[in-house]
Amino acid sequence: MAKKITAYIKLQVKAAQANPSPPVGPALGQHGVNIMEFCKAFNARTQGIEPGLPTPVIITVYSDRSFTFETKSTPASVLLKKAAGLTSGSAHPNTVKVGTVTRAQLEDIAKAKNADLTAADMEAAVRTIAGSARSMGLNVEGV
């Protein structure tokens, strides 16, 4: 018989920088999960990602207090801000434009996010990322 699932925990943790401090410690501690074991496994799995980029993770906790986790790709908004050299998007995206991204940058982001997107092909993925860029107040060149 399969192990009984007791909780799903969704967090955003900086790649290769997980530690027992909030938000990781309290979220895992209340379910009885070994926090240091998770931190070591997460840091090992995210070695290939640029350190410090927020990485979404879904942790499945079982009744025997064991766990498994799945990492997702960095959010598109973070990658777009990095590509445009910004710290935040526009407070009024329809009227105040704060930066510009090119089609080549959108294609790079779409390739990085491709596993998590539901787009049928790369062109649809680029259009999805372009829509996210516009909603952040970025001008999109070449789309």
UniProtKB/Swiss-Prot annotation:
Q: Which CDD domains does this UniProt record tie to the protein?
A: Ribosomal_L11
Keywords in alphabetical order = Methylation, Ribonucleoprotein, Ribosomal protein, RNA-binding, rRNA-binding
Its cellular-component GO annotations read: cytosolic large ribosomal subunit
The keyword Ribosomal protein is assigned to this record: yes
One Pfam entry for this protein is Ribosomal_L11_N
- Annotated Gene Ontology MF terms? large ribosomal subunit rRNA binding; structural constituent of ribosome
GO process annotations (BP): translation
Q: How is it modified after translation?
A: One or more lysine residues are methylated.
| Family annotation (PANTHER family) | 60S RIBOSOMAL PROTEIN L12, LARGE RIBOSOMAL SUBUNIT PROTEIN UL11M
Quote the NCBIfam families the UniProt record gives.
L11_bact
Give the family from UniProt: Belongs to the universal ribosomal protein uL11 family.
Assembly and binders: Part of the ribosomal stalk of the 50S ribosomal subunit. Interacts with L10 and the large rRNA to form the base of the stalk. L10 forms an elongated spine to which L12 dimers bind in a sequential fashion forming a multimeric L10(L12)X complex.
What is the role of this chain? Forms part of the ribosomal stalk which helps the ribosome interact with GTP-bound translation factors.
The protein's name in its UniProt record: Large ribosomal subunit protein uL11
Organism from which the protein derives: Pseudomonas savastanoi pv. phaseolicola (strain 1448A / Race 6) (Pseudomonas syringae pv. phaseolicola (strain 1448A / Race 6))
